[in-house]
From Swiss-Prot:
Binding site for UDP-N-acetyl-alpha-D-muramoyl-L-alanyl-D-glutamate: S30, T152, T153, S179, R187
Entry PTM: Carboxylation is probably crucial for Mg(2+) binding and, consequently, for the gamma-phosphate positioning of ATP.
Pathway in which the depicted protein is active: Cell wall biogenesis; peptidoglycan biosynthesis
Keywords: ATP-binding, Cell cycle, Cell division, Cell shape, Cell wall biogenesis/degradation, Cytoplasm, Ligase, Nucleotide-binding, Peptidoglycan synthesis
Top EC class of this enzyme: ligase
Residue runs in coiled coils: none
Family: Belongs to the MurCDEF family. MurE subfamily.
InterPro entries referenced in this protein's UniProt entry, alphabetically: Mur-like_cat_sf, Mur_ligase_C, Mur_ligase_C_dom_sf, Mur_ligase_cen, MurE/MurF_N, UDP-N-AcMur-Glu-dNH2Pim_ligase
This protein's name: UDP-N-acetylmuramoyl-L-alanyl-D-glutamate--L-lysine ligase
Gene, per the UniProt record: murE
EC number: 6.3.2.7
PANTHER family registered for this protein in UniProt: MUR LIGASE FAMILY MEMBER (PTHR23135), UDP-N-ACETYLMURAMOYL-L-ALANYL-D-GLUTAMATE--2,6-DIAMINOPIMELATE LIGASE MURE HOMOLOG, CHLOROPLASTIC (PTHR23135:SF4)
Amino acid sequence: MDASTLFKKVKVKRVLGSLEQQIDDITTDSRTAREGSIFVASVGYTVDSHKFCQNVADQGCKLVVVNKEQSLPANVTQVVVPDTLRVASILAHTLYDYPSHQLVTFGVTGTNGKTSIATMIHLIQRKLQKNSAYLGTNGFQINETKTKGANTTPETVSLTKKIKEAVDAGAESMTLEVSSHGLVLGRLRGVEFDVAIFSNLTQDHLDFHGTMEAYGHAKSLLFSQLGEDLSKEKYVVLNNDDSFSEYLRTVTPYEVFSYGIDEEAQFMAKNIQESLQGVSFDFVTPFGTYPVKSPYVGKFNISNIMAAMIAVWSKGTSLETIIKAVENLEPVEGRLEVLDPSLPIDLIIDYAHTADGMNKLIDAVQPFVKQKLIFLVGMAGERDLTKTPEMGRVACRADYVIFTPDNPANDDPKMLTAELAKGATHQNYIEFDDRAEGIKHAIDIAEPGDTVVLASKGREPYQIMPGHIKVPHRDDLIGLEAAYKKFGGGPVDQ
């Protein structure tokens, strides 16, 4: 596409050079800029990428978007704008032909449950033989092909490229995990959503948002800004068991479908039965009551299942068809995932990293603990420490607790575990500044019949260490290796 055409919708301060050049790529990553690319520089929290403009020029890039004029060769066109990232969104959606308009787009937000609900929607679509894509904490997936990702919600250009990739692969729908960071930072500008789903709101990310009010406002942006295509039917799915849903009703102009277990809602779960093999319940709807069975464990997953079913139903699939699909869904990686049921202990990994998430996790597993519940939890570095003692208190619902760091980054691991220990309500806990050693200790003290829960990371494949270096780490692999060494079995499948 000709650059002059691309910039027709952009208000610029000035253009230094010519826009008469062909463009086939947009990037905010200086390492990928080349001839035919537009490089969009920005001032980030830690890095100002304007300093890489000379690098991209050396790589053959002939057009940069900047917030102030740079010292560059005369053959490099500079487009000076007030807000480079807002312009990046406009350019990306224009160049890639507004990809979110070309499929059904589901957006899932909330403190806990985003990954589970988003994955369930994707898996239901696949059971219905529909081409589907997913993007979130567990990476990027088109049908069954997976690649890893860095952020729950990528920056705006990368996000648009992923949606375009899904469209080109024939995806009929795409489900996005929508983070509060992504909403505030404008990463979702220009994305056309068809259905927005809310799970819950509890304390998290106050290191970024400052207050719960600001955090809640960030979440609400999804529901007030579903897009500009008024010809499409759009819906909002809210959890009535969370009081924040009342506020979300006031900010959205779209039709709302509510679900709940404890509070009255349009769609409800009654007569709940739970086991470590899954859940069953009566799904009470405006159209009748349906029996539902699912392999997912825990009462909180019933809420997630309802949210996913309603979202898919809202776009025209019958509930009977969806319920049949739900019976045979694959596990959501790293979410209340039981590792190797042949072991004499129940070894479980989960992503729960807030007090609310941990409470729900313990509620789910405690009824099925045969002997002791051993619970390992970590606290992330450079994050909101005000929530940490409460996490420690909740963890002490278990018989024995292990406190570790989780992505300590530049914080002292001993400080992080000490913050968790401030909330301890009994003395049956131990602190490890090395998470891997903490996991090995959990297995070492476990006896047949015990339940070992490794919380806060799920299948996250790294630890963020000093200097923000990512070191390979997998809770599931470390736990299984230690369990096979003690109890026999294996080998660990890498």
